[in-house]
Regions:
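CheY-like receiver
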Residues: 127-167
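Recognition helix of helix-turn-helix DNA-binding domains
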Residues: 177-212
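Short alpha-helical "packing" element that flanks the helix-turn-helix/winged-helix DNA-binding module
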Residues: 167-174
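Charged, compositionally biased boundary regions
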Residues: 151-154, 174, 193
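Basic, Lys/Arg-enriched C-terminal extension of HTH/homeodomain DNA-binding domains
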Residues: 199-246
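Generic alpha-helical secondary-structure signal
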Residues: 49, 119, 186, 197, ...
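DNA-binding alpha-helical recognition surfaces that contact promoter or target DNA
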Residues: 118, 172, 196, 203, ...
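N-terminal regulatory/sensing modules of transcriptional regulators
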Residues: 1-144
Length: 246
């Protein structure tokens, strides 16, 4: 059994699998030497456990974009928490979520144990050296502001790539809400050509066949409800077709 780097506090591990997610997405954690561990299924249980276990590491089953507001709450309340989101596949919007939250990392469920151990070491060291105030201030955005920030990061990153001219135009129109038929009319081309351009972009970014391009690169803006649990559910529903990735 491999242990974390000497000098770090004993590791407490939270395995979080929210209702609707597949626990088979968890990686093999047998190589981690932990002081204590627990499996949880509700956001309320996770937040309460982090209150009682400061400095714990979380491994969550599923893509982070489907639980965006939950992670915002986690990092706002417990800014030094390390979170690994484990899944069979990730979408471009998930990469943007990883880039926004300093201590959130994407891992594939088939990741070798030795790699997970090393990533845990580096992440835990980074968390204890980070200013909590910096992370707290970054996570005070409102729900619409947070969703727009993630979507903007995704769009800027994807459009900065060397895309074919037709692919760039198709991407822009689809993300603006145009249907494939309307996109074809605006570009003066056929629906099949639009479909082919979309498939090329999906292949470029490893987007599964069953996931529409707009759902892979954009989180839909949820209706904001003052109930703490309602926005989490709305963003989870608006992040698109997570079931296709399990």
């Amino acid at each position: 059994m491999q242990t974390l780097t000497r000098g770090l506090p004993p590791l407490r591990l939270i395995m979080f699998c929210q209702s609707g997610e597949n626990p088979a997405q968890f990686p093999d954690t047998g190589g981690l030497c932990v002081e204590d561990s627990v499996r949880l299924r509700t956001p309320e249980g996770l937040l309460d456990r982090l209150r009682r276990w400061p400095g714990a590491m979380v491994i969550s089953a599923g893509r982070p974009s489907t639980q965006l507001l939950l992670w915002q709450q986690v990092f706002q309340r417990y800014p030094r928490t390390v979170v690994f989101c484990s899944s069979n596949a990730f979408l471009p919007v998930d990469v943007s979520v990883e880039g926004y939250f300093r201590h959130l990392r994407l891992i594939k469920c088939a990741m070798p144990v030795r790699v997970l151990v090393r990533m845990a070491e580096l992440a835990m060291w980074s968390s204890v050296q980070t200013s909590p105030y910096e992370e707290e201030m970054k996570n005070v955005l409102s729900v619409p502001e947070l969703v727009m920030e993630i979507n903007s990061r995704t769009l800027v990153r994807l459009l900065s790539e060397r895309l074919p001219k037709q692919g760039r135009r198709v991407l822009g129109l689809l993300l603006s809400g145009c249907s494939p038929e309307m996109t074809a009319r605006m570009l003066g081309t056929g629906v099949r050509q639009v479909w082919l351009a979309e498939q090329t972009l999906k292949q470029r970014w490893d987007i599964p066949a069953g996931v529409p391009l707009p759902d892979a690169v954009r989180i839909r803006m949820p209706d904001v409800n003052p109930d703490i649990n309602q926005p989490i559910a709305l963003v989870k529903a608006g992040a698109g077709n997570a079931s296709d990735l399990r």
